[in-house]
């Protein structure tokens, strides 16, 4: 929840101090956060501190994470946009999205491999990762704060809300789909939790691969306009979730891939459309805030939806969010067409 107030604030700092500076701050916060997390875990495991003290250290670690790491993705996106230039903005955003997808794909594999060494080895890896990133980033040229063009606003306006609503609905739909995988798979595997866990891992891996394909095949070559991407994303997301309602396992996998492919098209599309109206730093910050709102909305709805006892209830709710997303994209298309 700390992402909500901190993301827009960091967006303003990007415009004031430059994106590289903000990325370095975010990496520093990332390193401090996981150092505290590892320290608290070790102290509690060895009995050096009471559980209350150890829990306090872990809470402080998460607070540091929420207040600083919220700057990471927006700052990286703006940095990539500024270095790429106006003609390659979509490809720049696709590069950042590709990095995130690779992290989702290989992160769990790295963690599983590190567990062979020690139960806390994944935390050690997270402590070392920001130091390695800092070494690489310090050598890259930074970009000075960019003046905001007169046609762009520096503050949020009512006209920008459809783009933020798209971001919120996308995050909510994807979160509910991921949380709904295990309940939905009980239709095929009943209470076999081991098999269900394996299937969820395969589905999440497939989701990351589908997103990578979208980013390399569609986004990086810049084959479609942002509005066309947004409309395509709505259709693909709704279609994918509708396919996932089927009981056949192969259709469930197909639907997950179609959904993830469509979702990968959406984020660069609404970010580019918003950046045409709002300063890059402010736009990235508000979109990050909207994504967090989507995750929060999902967290609020999950207990209510789960009470229905229907195995695919969360998938149905995700489909509803995707349909709303599609309706908003049509509204954006009509607004752009009228201009």
Language model regions located:
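Central cavity-lining transmembrane alpha-helices of secondary-active solute carriers
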Residues: 1-12, 202-217
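C-terminal ends and interior cores of transmembrane alpha-helices
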Residues: 29-51, 236-247
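Hydrophobic core of transmembrane alpha-helices in multi-pass small-molecule transporters
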Residues: 48-71, 168, 251-265
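Cytoplasmic helix-loop-helix junction between adjacent transmembrane helices
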Residues: 61-100
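Intracellular juxtamembrane helix-capping segments at the cytosolic ends
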Residues: 71-84, 264-278
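Short amphipathic helix-loop junctions that connect adjacent transmembrane helices
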Residues: 179-199
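C-terminal transmembrane helical hairpin of 12-TM major facilitator-type secondary transporters
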Residues: 226-269
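A late C-terminal transmembrane helix in Major Facilitator Superfamily
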Residues: 280-310
